[in-house]
UniProtKB/Swiss-Prot annotation:
Identification of the protein by name: Large ribosomal subunit protein uL1
InterPro entries in the record: Ribosom_uL1_bac-type, Ribosomal_uL1, Ribosomal_uL1-like, Ribosomal_uL1/biogenesis, Ribosomal_uL1_3-a/b-sand, Ribosomal_uL1_CS
Domain of life of the organism encoding this protein: Bacteria
Keyword Chloroplast in annotation: no
Molecular function terms, GO-annotated: rRNA binding; structural constituent of ribosome; tRNA binding
Entry function: Binds directly to 23S rRNA. The L1 stalk is quite mobile in the ribosome, and is involved in E site tRNA release.
Organism ancestry: Bacteria, Pseudomonadati, Pseudomonadota, Alphaproteobacteria, Hyphomicrobiales
Amino acid sequence: MAGKRTRKINEGVDPTKLYALTTAIGMVKERAVAKFDETIEVSMNLGVDPRHADQMVRGVVNLPNGTGRTVRVAVFARGAKADEAKAAGADVVGAEDLVEIVQGGKIEFDRCIATPDMMPLVGRLGKVLGPRGMMPNPKVGTVTMDVAGAVKASKGGAVEFRVEKAGIVHAGIGKASFDAKALEENIRAFADAVIKAKPAGAKGNYVKRVAISSTMGPGVKIEVGSVTAAPTA
């Protein structure tokens, strides 16, 4: 039954063809037929080798229409900064007590923020947070004195990205319930951020391939130019 359903969902998607962005979005939305609101993900194959330090691609982008998911935020801070984080809507706030909780394996958050003075303490959690991509980093705005701003950005649609071994960078950029225009705006914002994060060591063709998919649906390949070009009115 599952195989039959998969074949039906895949019908009409030519894996050898490149589709215009707006067409691809429509195809993915049509095939997002699961009983839950599927996440729409974009993946970009880049002409970089992240094994070289000068070809690492990472950054953060604030999606104009949010991600559609509830993001739980933890903040490592003390005193007034801890109060600011709580007022901004942080789900978990602490210092040594929060370090102990995380070291114990209890990670009930999706994103982690810290004030600079907390980093010697948070550094102990590298083996726990690092593999999950949650280690606070000033390059993506998660080590900051503006904890309120960072919490609000995280809750409001900030998405971190980091290139993986095969030169692929990907992220969830919305839900199947989003209208096509909102998804298009989010995809363009993500692609623009990745392009702006092009490292000095990147040679030749930077964006090689782009595809989008839903959680349970097939990948639909997109014409790179239709993602990087300015949208038509």
